[in-house]
Design a protein with these regions (language model features):
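Mature soluble binding/inhibitory domains
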Residues: 1-92, 96-143
Length: 143
């Protein structure tokens, strides 16, 4: 699963300032290598207006089902700390994808469980993402 581009962060997503909206840039790769227990890759997620820059290279799992891909892991926020993340995407070009690439990012403090960012705050982790990616962005899922 790979992707890159941008989206508009909706109101309520950035818990430190719920009224803040704006452009978020993202890039990610995640895949299993032969005989590997955990997937490998990198996830970058930056919300400039929120002064938030998240980077992860540690992954717990990757699950692909049709046009949907979800992976979970942990990384650092603004270069420090320990934060879990859950990234769920839909490849709009695949059967069942609906013609639009969609994206959900949830980031929370590993120690306290406090949510830092979730562009579908309050939704189940199993829900399909609803936020469309911006023009020129791309999400590609390959098995």
């Amino acid at each position: 699963t790979i992707g890159g581009g941008w989206l508009t962060s909706p109101p309520g997503a950035y818990l430190a300032n719920p009224s803040l909206t704006g452009k978020v840039s993202f890039g990610f790769t995640s895949r299993y290598f032969k005989n590997a227990t955990n997937p490998k890759g990198e996830t970058q997620f930056s919300f400039i207006l929120g002064d938030m820059d998240f980077n992860a290279v540690n992954f717990d799992y990757l699950v692909i089902s049709g046009a949907k891909s979800q992976f979970k892991g942990f990384g650092k926020l603004n270069g420090s700390g320990a934060y879990n993340f859950l990234l769920t995407v839909i490849d709009g070009d695949l059967p069942g994808g609906g013609g639009v690439d969609r994206f959900r990012m949830k980031i929370w403090n590993k120690a306290t469980g406090a949510i830092v960012y979730d562009n579908q705050f309050g939704a189940s982790d199993a829900d399909d993402p609803t936020t469309p990616v911006g023009s020129g962005s791309a999400i590609t899922i390959q098995k």
